[in-house]
Amino acid sequence: MMHLLADPETWVAIAFVILMGLFAYLGVHRMVLKALDHRADRIRDELAEAKRLKDEAAKVLADYKTRRASAEREAEEIVTSAKAEAERIAADAKAKMEDFVARRTKAAESKIALAEAQALADVRAAAAEAAVQAAATVLSQSVKGGLGDDLVAKGIAEVSRKLN
């Protein structure tokens, strides 16, 4: 047995048994279990909080995606509406321009017709005046005397009245 007392491993085993007994007597194992339970509870709470935050983040992400899709649809509607409005404005402007051109053309044609009619009237008046002058000259040379002058004056007045 002496041989066992000289062996350092024996003393380590005896010290270990005494230490474990002392720990058991003082209730160290309860303190360790309590600390481990406390740590497990804290980890469980952190996991629950992490799950809650994950769920909340998923809801926020879903809300963001919904809002983004809604905003994209709204933007497309705005673009479509703007294109339709631009096309309507362009068509309206084209119609107004065509109407303006048609009115201007009609007014120009009316002015041209009026000018033609005036020119024709002026030409007729000039022709009538020339015919009257020619007739007066011919008659005055062929008929002499007071009666001739009278006839020439009446004839000129009648021709002027009928031609104008």
Swiss-Prot record:
Q: What is its main location?
A: membrane
* Bilayer-crossing regions: 8-28
The protein's gene is named: atpF1
Protein name listed in UniProt: ATP synthase subunit b 1
Query: Can you say where in the cell this protein is located?
Result: Cell inner membrane
Highest taxon listed in the record's lineage: Bacteria
Q: Which HAMAP family match?
A: ATP_synth_b_bprime (MF_01398)
Q: What does this protein do?
A: F(1)F(0) ATP synthase produces ATP from ADP in the presence of a proton or sodium gradient. F-type ATPases consist of two structural domains, F(1) containing the extramembraneous catalytic core and F(0) containing the membrane proton channel, linked together by a central stalk and a peripheral stalk. During catalysis, ATP synthesis in the catalytic domain of F(1) is coupled via a rotary mechanism of the central stalk subunits to proton translocation.
Q: Provide the leader sequence positions.
A: none
Q: Which GO terms describe its cellular component?
A: plasma membrane; proton-transporting ATP synthase complex
Keywords noted in UniProt: ATP synthesis, Cell inner membrane, Cell membrane, CF(0), Hydrogen ion transport, Ion transport, Membrane, Transmembrane, Transmembrane helix, Transport
Q: How does it sit in the membrane?
A: Single-pass membrane protein
Q: Name one GO molecular function term.
A: proton-transporting ATP synthase activity, rotational mechanism
Q: Which Pfam families match?
A: ATP-synt_B
**Known partners and oligomeric status:** F-type ATPases have 2 components, F(1) - the catalytic core - and F(0) - the membrane proton channel. F(1) has five subunits: alpha(3), beta(3), gamma(1), delta(1), epsilon(1). F(0) has three main subunits: a(1), b(2) and c(10-14). The alpha and beta chains form an alternating ring which encloses part of the gamma chain. F(1) is attached to F(0) by a central stalk formed by the gamma and epsilon chains, while a peripheral stalk is formed by the delta and b chains.
Query: What family does the database annotate?
Result: Belongs to the ATPase B chain family.
